[in-house]
């Protein structure tokens, strides 16, 4: 087994182990940050899909009933320095075309997120975040929390309260006399997720409420006041400000007094105070645009770099990774650090055997920030980046202008093929239960799954292969795997596109492509024609030149075309069904030009997409409407020549507010 495979397997085993402890045995051994650290180390193997690998939460625990959130419980975007906060403030000002925006600042409680539902004032249900869309039903457990309101006086209809459950530091010391828990966060998680509510009742759980859905409040500060009036616990540390200086001042004040608090916090949360503006800002794929978590400063530690080894990812990138003498950095035991690429190694002059300084900020993958050259032994050789792939022996290549070095043998390199297969069956792609990393490697080595479509013809080949003779396989486990594969023969278009593992086409880009082309045949036929003209694809808002070039490269290879034909013969790929079928903009291709006065270009695009439109930057005969603001460019003249209907800003506002064109 190669170094890459060993590390990949080790990380996956660790994640699976902690999943069982956290979700099934209620005995978590590591914090959320440490768990995220493992996942992001795993994602480091394939750095180009790092953003698409990140998830909002964890899958719902099968031991509990599932609760679907009416509004997703999204995570927050993170910042780790003042520049990140400044960027957040500037971005929302540009989006809303506002010079002054009121921001509410609150501490970020290091606890467990919850949602509580009230019907006509009566507490009826509570759920965890889960994966952000579906959580676990913990109604009976939340009901045992001392002081948690069971009835809200004068409340009619449905009301949802969200917040954070925690255990205070003083209570944790009493609870943890036998060192059963690693920290207060894990103790709270383990206590809340008990099948026996009596155990939960015996634990000193507390909470802070911070969100109210279904009320009439107009601002976040009003929400907090209302929650307090209804009898909920609300954190006393909060501040309203309209300036960057005010935001940073609150951060510094709380940072300096954090050890005087009787509960753990790991940063500050900034929220746009006006709820109407929050609604206008909307959400990205993973987080609300109206909020930011400014995590506390990075933690540093020194250790020895034992060895630099190379990982080969799904797209062929050779990524150097530092193997370290394990060191505790901010409560997390770090034994690996990212070295990014050969340019980074040369720039910092990193060598095996060096004493290095490790930086860890929040849940970001640890980085080497400094090398102690005074401690370096004489004649320590420079690290030489391999000229051949460590997995298949092929001569590596580096594209001009890129730092990444790649193995070109996309289909002959075992490491790449195994990683492609793992990606294909992963949770966000085909999600084939029972076909995990170890099983993929097992079937690949046996020659039973060499190509992606082999997965769906596995049953036929097993007729000639006695799998029951292999360790760990029996009649039941084989039947379960084949049933799992069979159940995944129907898939949505966006998940199918994502499953192919095309460079620069992550979950968000796959959704954009699916929404734009609607059906697999439309998408496939358009991609086949890319060699003739890719301007339409480049114009799709959010795809860009790199994504278009990557798709063009993918579809130029006969191997990929054959793979798609073989694969689609086994599948049913569902077309996109629009949730905006009654909108006059549904499935219309829209292009913007000129300056809009009432809203930013960014907000206009979001509004258009919400109504089912396809936003493009490329004007063609296929364009349905050109939205023209002040001082329109050459697109206006071209639209006239092509006969594309042109809407001015007043007409545009009628469309998005009234649903009419004139």
UniProtKB/Swiss-Prot annotation:
Give GO terms: molecular function aspect only. Answer: DNA ligase (NAD+) activity; metal ion binding
Q: Which reaction does it catalyse?
A: NAD(+) + (deoxyribonucleotide)n-3'-hydroxyl + 5'-phospho-(deoxyribonucleotide)m = (deoxyribonucleotide)n+m + AMP + beta-nicotinamide D-nucleotide
Q: Where does NAD(+) bind?
A: 32-36, 75-76, 106, 129, 164, 271, 295
Read off the CDD domains from this record: BRCT_DNA_ligase_like, LIGANc
Query: Where, in this chain's numbering, is Zn(2+) bound?
Result: 389, 392, 407, 413
Named cofactor requirement(s): Mg(2+); Mn(2+)
Top-rank taxon of the source lineage equals Bacteria
- Which positions are tagged coiled coil? none
Under Enzyme Commission nomenclature, its number is 6.5.1.2
Q: Name one GO cellular component term.
A: cytosol
Which enzyme class, named as a word? ligase
Which GO annotations describe the biological process of this protein?
DNA repair; DNA replication
**Stored InterPro entries:** BRCT_dom, BRCT_dom_sf, DisA/LigA_HHH, DNA_ligase, DNA_ligase_AS, DNA_ligase_CS, DNAligase_adenylation, DNAligase_N
**Which SMART domains does UniProt cross-reference here?**
BRCT, LIGANc
State the UniProt keywords alphabetically: DNA damage, DNA repair, DNA replication, Ligase, Magnesium, Manganese, Metal-binding, NAD, Zinc
Summary of the function given for this chain in its UniProt record: DNA ligase that catalyzes the formation of phosphodiester linkages between 5'-phosphoryl and 3'-hydroxyl groups in double-stranded DNA using NAD as a coenzyme and as the energy source for the reaction. It is essential for DNA replication and repair of damaged DNA.
Q: Which PANTHER family does the record cross-reference, listed alphabetically?
A: CHROMOSOME TRANSMISSION FIDELITY FACTOR 18, DNA LIGASE
- Family statement: Belongs to the NAD-dependent DNA ligase family. LigA subfamily.
Q: What is this protein called?
A: DNA ligase
């Amino acid at each position: 087994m190669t170094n890459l495979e060993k590390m990949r397997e080790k990380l996956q085993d660790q994640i699976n182990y902690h999943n069982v402890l956290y979700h099934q045995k209620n005995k978590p051994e590591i914090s959320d940050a440490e768990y995220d650290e493992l996942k992001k180390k795993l994602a480091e193997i394939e750095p180009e899909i790092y953003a698409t690998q990140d998830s909002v939460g964890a899958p719902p625990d099968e031991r509990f009933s599932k609760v679907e959130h009416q509004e997703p419980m999204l995570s927050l975007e993170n910042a780790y320095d003042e520049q990140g906060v400044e960027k957040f403030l500037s971005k929302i000002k540009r989006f809303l075309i506002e010079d002054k925006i009121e921001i509410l600042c609150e501490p970020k409680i290091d606890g467990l997120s919850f949602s509580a539902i009230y019907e006509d004032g009566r507490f009826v249900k509570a759920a965890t975040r889960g994966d952000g869309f579906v959580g676990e039903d913990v109604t009976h457990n939340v009901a045992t929390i001392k002081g948690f309101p069971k009835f809200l006086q004068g409340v009619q209809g449905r009301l949802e309260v969200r917040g954070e459950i925690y255990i205070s530091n003083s209570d944790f010391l009493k609870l943890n006399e036998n060192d059963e828990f690693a920290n207060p966060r894990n103790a709270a998680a383990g206590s809340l997720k008990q099948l026996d509510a009596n155990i939960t009742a015996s634990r000193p759980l507390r909470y802070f409420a911070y969100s109210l859905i279904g009320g009439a409040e107009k601002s976040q500060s009003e929400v907090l006041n209302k929650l307090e009036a209804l009898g909920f616990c609300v954190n006393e540390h909060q501040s309203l400000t309209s300036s960057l200086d005010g935001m940073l001042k609150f951060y510094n004040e709380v940072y300096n007094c954090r050890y005087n608090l009787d509960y753990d916090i790991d940063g500050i949360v900034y929220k746009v105070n006006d709820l109407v503006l929050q609604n206008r800002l909307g959400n990205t794929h993973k987080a609300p645009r109206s909020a930011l978590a400014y995590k506390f400063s990075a933690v540093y530690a020194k250790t020895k770099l034992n060895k630099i080894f190379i990982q080969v990812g799904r797209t062929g990138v050779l990524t150097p990774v530092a193997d370290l003498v394990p060191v505790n950095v901010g409560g997390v035991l770090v034994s690996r650090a990212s070295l990014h690429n050969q340019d980074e190694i040369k720039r910092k002059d990193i060598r095996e055997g060096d004493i290095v300084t490790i930086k860890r900020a929040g849940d970001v993958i640890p980085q080497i920030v400094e090398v102690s050259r005074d401690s370096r032994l004489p004649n320590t050789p420079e690290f030489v980046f391999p000229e051949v792939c460590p997995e298949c022996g092929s001569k590596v290549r580096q594209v001009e202008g890129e730092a990444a070095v790649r193995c070109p043998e996309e289909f002959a390199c075992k490491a790449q093929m195994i990683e492609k297969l793992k990606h294909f069956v992963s949770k966000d792609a085909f999600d084939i239960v029972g076909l995990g990393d170890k099983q993929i490697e097992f079937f690949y080595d046996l020659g039973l799954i060499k190509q992606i479509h082999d997965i769906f013809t596995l049953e036929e080949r097993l007729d000639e292969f006695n799998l029951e003779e292999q360790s760990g396989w029996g009649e039941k486990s084989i039947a379960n795997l084949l049933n799992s594969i069979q159940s995944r023969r129907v898939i949505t278009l966006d998940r199918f596109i994502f499953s192919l593992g095309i460079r620069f086409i992550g979950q968000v880009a796959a959704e954009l492509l699916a929404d734009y082309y609607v059906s697999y045949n439309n998408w496939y036929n358009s991609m086949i024609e890319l060699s003739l003209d890719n301007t339409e694809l480049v114009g799709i808002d959010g795809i860009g030149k790199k994504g278009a070039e990557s798709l063009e490269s993918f579809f130029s290879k006969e191997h990929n075309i054959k793979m798609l034909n073989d694969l689609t013969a086994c599948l049913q790929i569902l077309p996109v069904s629009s949730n905006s079928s009654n909108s006059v903009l549904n499935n219309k291709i829209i292009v913007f030009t000129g300056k809009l006065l009432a809203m930013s270009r960014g907000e206009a695009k979001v509004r258009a997409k919400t109504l089912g439109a396809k936003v493009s930057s490329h004007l063609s005969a296929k364009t349905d409407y050109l939205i023209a603001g002040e001082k329109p460019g050459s697109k206006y003249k071209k639209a006239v020549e092509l006969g594309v209907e042109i809407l001015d800003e007043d007409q545009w506002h009628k469309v998005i507010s009234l649903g009419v064109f004139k």
